Regions:
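Alpha-helical transmembrane segments
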Residues: 19-34, 113-120, 171-172
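Extracytoplasmic catalytic/substrate-binding loops of multi-pass membrane glycan-assembly enzymes
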Residues: 31-51, 57-69
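Juxtamembrane "helix-exit" motif on the non-cytosolic side of transmembrane helices
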Residues: 37-43, 73, 102, 123-133
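Short hydrophobic/aromatic helix or loop-helix immediately within or flanking a transmembrane segment
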Residues: 56-81, 85, 89
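Hydrophobic transmembrane alpha-helices
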Residues: 95-103, 147-159, 173
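Membrane-interface alpha helices of multi-pass inner-membrane proteins
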Residues: 165-181
C-alpha cells in the first residue's frame, strides 16, 4: 500500500510540475470561482455560524464531522472570503487528486485530457452551487476529498492489495465525511 501511495504522490507531483496544467487550472479556478469568492452571499445560517459551531447546534443535526473540522481549524465565526478561498483551493486539490488517479490508471502522457477534466470539474455549476448557499462549504469539499481518497484506496485494495482489514478501516474512515453533510 505504501508503494501505491508513493506512485500517486509521484503522479500528483508530475501534474503540479507541468506548467501548462498548473497555470490553466489556476486560470480556470479564478474565472470560475473568483466572483463567488469576492462577491459572497449572506444567508441566515451564515450569520449564526458561531452559534452552530460554538454552541454545538450543529451536533444536534448529527453533523459531528463538520463540528470537528471547524473546531480543529478554529473556525467559529463567519468570514466568507477565507472560507470560500479555502473551499476553492480544496476544489482545485480535489481536481488534481482525481486527475492523478486517471493519469496513473490510463497512463496517458498528454496533459490535455487532465486539463479538460480539471477545467470541467472546477467550473461545473453543480460543483459550484454550494458556494452560494452553504456556510459549511469547506466541510463539503474536505469530505469530498476524503471520499475520493477512500474510493481510490478501495479501488487499489480490490485490484492490487486484497487486504480485507483495509475495507473495515476505510469504512470507519468514511463515517467522517458522511457526518460532514
Amino acid at each position: 500500500m505504501k508503494q501505491i501511495v508513493k506512485e500517486y504522490l509521484i503522479e500528483i507531483k508530475d501534474l503540479l510540475k507541468n506548467k501548462k496544467y498548473l497555470y490553466t487550472i489556476i486560470f480556470i479556478s479564478i474565472l470560475s470561482l473568483g466572483f463567488a469568492i469576492t462577491h459572497y452571499s449572506i444567508g441566515v445560517d451564515d450569520l449564526c455560524l458561531n452559534r452552530y459551531v460554538s454552541d454545538t447546534y450543529i451536533l444536534s443535526q448529527k453533523r459531528w464531522g463538520t463540528w470537528l473540522l471547524y473546531n480543529m481549524l478554529n473556525i467559529n465565526e463567519f468570514s466568507p472570503f477565507w472560507l470560500d478561498f479555502l473551499t476553492a483551493t480544496g476544489l482545485v486539490i480535489l481536481a488534481v487528486i482525481v486527475s492523478a488517479f486517471i493519469k496513473k490508471e490510463t497512463k496517458e502522457k498528454s496533459v490535455l485530457p487532465y486539463i479538460i477534466f480539471s477545467g470541467v470539474f472546477i467550473s461545473s455549476p453543480i460543483i459550484n452551487n454550494f458556494f452560494m448557499y452553504q456556510s459549511t462549504n469547506l466541510a463539503i469539499v474536505i469530505s469530498n476529498i476524503i471520499i475520493i481518497i477512500c474510493g481510490i484506496l478501495i479501488y487499489n485494495n480490490y485490484f492490487k492489495c486484497k487486504r480485507k482489514w483495509l475495507y473495515i478501516l476505510i469504512g470507519i474512515g468514511m463515517t467522517i465525511p458522511i457526518a460532514m453533510y
